[in-house]
């Protein structure tokens, strides 16, 4: 399905408007086609460029749709990526407004910080591991500018992979000696378990997800760099969020992270 530049720009503006106004819009797939990933990423790039021009600072990338349970929840069958900005980052145990993210949901993830550039489109698992400086637990608060989370692959891609904000926990660890694949995750809401999983549910290994991202970004001419933060994807099902909720996640061998949601 051919999509004009004018249409791409109109859809990008509609997503920005939804974010600014707090009012979700209809799915984009009707305008660009259900399988038009090229157009979806073009919309995402337009909004990233708009954000950078407005002074927002890129600090890394997120990988979405890596967990089979999340894929089933959203009716998709492949990963995607989005851009992380500095103003999306929050500290461990912060209290966030429930209106911080539109239609918020939460998931626990393993975050990586690179200490070397990854310029090659054929980056290997070993090269990715060598380039990873630090590992830490994270909570990603995802959101959707699309009404009722009625999304397919192209909808979430265009919407910056349904990015909202994220919380980084601790301690910060070196990768050596940490078994990311076997790392078990348990997330609670107000003390009751609501999500669980392990690193193996993230494309078989969180570093597999990071390799996919490194290859993809290098192929696009935007390779990952030293200092970049990578959110590697959900370790278990995402969970809805309401005002007053407190979430805590523990990832075995890595650490803990928490966040609380207050009123508007």
From Swiss-Prot:
Entry's family note: Belongs to the hydratase/decarboxylase family. MhpD subfamily.
Recorded GO CC terms: cytoplasm
Function per UniProt: Catalyzes the conversion of 2-hydroxypentadienoic acid (enolic form of 2-oxopent-4-enoate) to 4-hydroxy-2-ketopentanoic acid.
Keyword Lyase: yes
Cofactor entry: a divalent metal cation
EC number: 4.2.1.80
Entry keywords, A to Z: Aromatic hydrocarbons catabolism, Lyase
Catalyzed chemical reaction(s): (S)-4-hydroxy-2-oxopentanoate = (2Z)-2-hydroxypenta-2,4-dienoate + H2O
Class of enzymatic activity (EC top level): lyase
Nucleus in keyword set: no
Native organism: Azotobacter vinelandii (strain DJ / ATCC BAA-1303)
Pathway: Aromatic compound metabolism; 3-phenylpropanoate degradation
GO molecular function, one term: manganese ion binding
This protein's name: 2-keto-4-pentenoate hydratase
HAMAP family to which the protein is assigned, alphabetical: MhpD
SUPFAM superfamilies for this protein: FAH
Any single GO BP term: 3-phenylpropionate catabolic process
